[in-house]
A protein has these predicted regions:
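Class I SAM-dependent transferase core
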Residues: 1-64, 69, 103-106, 110-117
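Short amphipathic alpha-helical segments
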Residues: 109-110, 149-152, 175-176
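Short catalytic micro-motifs in class I SAM-dependent methyltransferases
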Residues: 140-144
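Conserved beta-strand signature within the Rossmann-like core of class I S-adenosyl-L-methionine
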Residues: 159-170
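Active-site capping/gating segments
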Residues: 169-209
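Residue-level signal for inorganic ion chemistry
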Residues: 29, 82, 166
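A short glycine-rich, Lys/Arg-flanked "PGG" loop and its adjoining helix->strand segment in the class I
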Residues: 149-161
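Conserved SAM/SAH cofactor-binding pocket of Class I
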Residues: 56-134, 139
Length: 209
């Protein structure tokens, strides 16, 4: 058995149907990658380990799955993977994928239809999206931490949780964000890269001067 598929079975107790959805996702992603540049060419042979597994690791960090917003979704990471696992677990909740590229949004909608997912695709600038106070925001390979908080805080000061998937500059990004905001942060080492971390940020407030 493929080690990456075994990971999903052991970690998330996924069904055969869910494994089939992941395989469909893999094939459709590769089929569209040349045209849309969804993932780096060097990762095309490692979609499960580099992208699917990486995205799935934040699933259990999302305590409230009633509304999840994936910002800068692009190829659907991590939002599509999260929604696939929610369907596997029969968890109801709203999942929204936001991306400013019309072509990538069409890819996401076509993929959602292929996988029979119930999610919403928003072709909109993040600055123009109105967040609910119950939203949990997730992102992977998006803007710098302080820039992300700037946009989210401006749109809704009551967002509960932000889960950011970051590379080796995560600490510098946190330090920069703390110059402008106070917040609670939990750090989790990535299971796919020793240099990467997941940041779970909450209780955000502007620093008073």
């Amino acid at each position: 058995m493929n080690n990456d598929i075994e990971f999903f079975i052991k970690k998330f107790n996924v069904s055969r149907e869910t494994i089939e959805k992941l395989n469909i996702y893999n094939d459709f992603l590769l089929e569209n990658n040349k045209l849309l540049n969804l993932i780096g060419k060097t990762t095309e042979k490692h979609v499960f380990s580099r992208h699917f597994k990486d995205s799935a690791q934040i699933y259990n960090l999302i305590e409230d799955k009633s509304e999840i917003i994936d910002i800068g979704s692009g190829a659907g990471f991590p939002g599509i993977i999260i929604n696939i696992l929610m369907v596997n677990d029969k968890i109801k909740g709203n999942v929204v994928l936001i991306d400013k590229s019309p072509k990538k949004c069409k890819f996401l909608q076509d993929l959602s239809n292929k996988l029979s997912l119930m999610l919403k695709i928003e072709n909109i600038r993040l600055e123009d999206y109105k967040f609910s106070k119950i939203s949990t925001v997730v992102s992977r390979a998006f803007k710098k931490t302080v820039d992300t908080i700037d946009i989210l805080f401006k749109n809704n000061e009551k967002i509960r949780n932000i889960i950011l998937m970051k590379g080796k500059t995560y600490q510098q990004e946190l330090d920069d964000a703390k110059k402008k905001y106070t917040f609670h942060v939990e750090k989790f080492r990535s299971i796919t890269s020793d240099e990467s971390y997941i940041l779970k940020i909450s209780d955000i407030k502007l620093t008073t001067t």
